[in-house]
């Protein structure tokens, strides 16, 4: 992904950066991995260990840090919806843009995200401007509630230059491509 913040040529094990499909039709089919964890995953999943290979995700923030498996560019594939059709098909909701804050537990199960801006959706139309919009939930339920993703015309690459992980803490650039998407029954908070 040429414009992604998590883009690199080779990871810190010398493995070329590559596309790894993680989820297909709601099921995990691949994982970010290193040379070591690829073999461990193959054994755990009952896959052919001889076929196991690193996904090229072993990175360190500096020469004086041990490489760890890190997020690279993780993207949601574009869907088939136009933005106008997505809004028109939504009776009641909030359209949120631009990530502002995040909090997620170590197991990546419980999360809360805040956004810069939001718009009320009523009767299939964008309405008044909202500030300090947040959404919170549990990861499996959240992703299972996605029922629409906009098309490639609306797909953009976003990212963060300060994704922290590890002990001692390592900061890395990570990217994610996405188009506007709709999630049902998500707990939200807004200031009007």
Regions found by a protein language model. Give the residues of each.
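N-terminal small-residue-enriched
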Residues: 1-192
